[in-house]
């Protein structure tokens, strides 16, 4: 059974902190064994579905990593990949202890639906600890272009 490490998130927008986690995943799990899963989160603003699909294609091509958009519960995506013959490992990126507390709580919800889930937490490098998609969106709302240095050019 082949291992597939899945890095899920809304990635709205995908930034250099996310890229740092993807780089770590490739070192740990190996090229060809990782996937980015972009979840459509109803509580987070998304422009439109076609734009999201186009961005995911560009991201996949740029990183040379499969990117899949899903609009189901995360455990359902994991079960789908397991049914395709993969041993799935869920990868969660962390910036700090607050993220760990949040992710631990989210994992409890996921385990209410799927008990046997493998999770790896990867901490980003210190230089990326302050970067978040929500902070980038806030910067951009005040002055478009002000957060460009944090974004991955897709």
Show which residues each predicted segment covers.
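Nucleotidyltransferase catalytic core that binds NTPs
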Residues: 1-154
């Amino acid at each position: 059974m082949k291992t597939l490490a899945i890095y899920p998130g809304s990635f709205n927008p995908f930034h250099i902190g996310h890229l740092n986690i993807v780089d770590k995943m490739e070192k740990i799990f190996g090229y060809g064994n990782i996937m980015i899963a972009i979840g459509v989160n109803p509580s987070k603003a998304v422009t439109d579905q076609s734009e999201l699909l186009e961005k995911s294609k560009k991201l996949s091509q740029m990183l040379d990593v499969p990117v899949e958009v899903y609009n189901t519960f995360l455990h359902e995506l994991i079960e789908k990949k397991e049914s395709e013959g993969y041993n799935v490992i869920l990868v969660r990126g962390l910036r700090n202890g607050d993220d760990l507390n949040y992710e631990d709580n989210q994992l409890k919800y996921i385990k209410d639906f799927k008990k046997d889930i493998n999770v790896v937490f990867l901490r980003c490098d210190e230089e990326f600890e302050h970067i978040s998609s929500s902070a980038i969106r806030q910067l951009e709302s005040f002055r478009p272009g002000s957060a460009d240095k944090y974004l991955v050019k897709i």
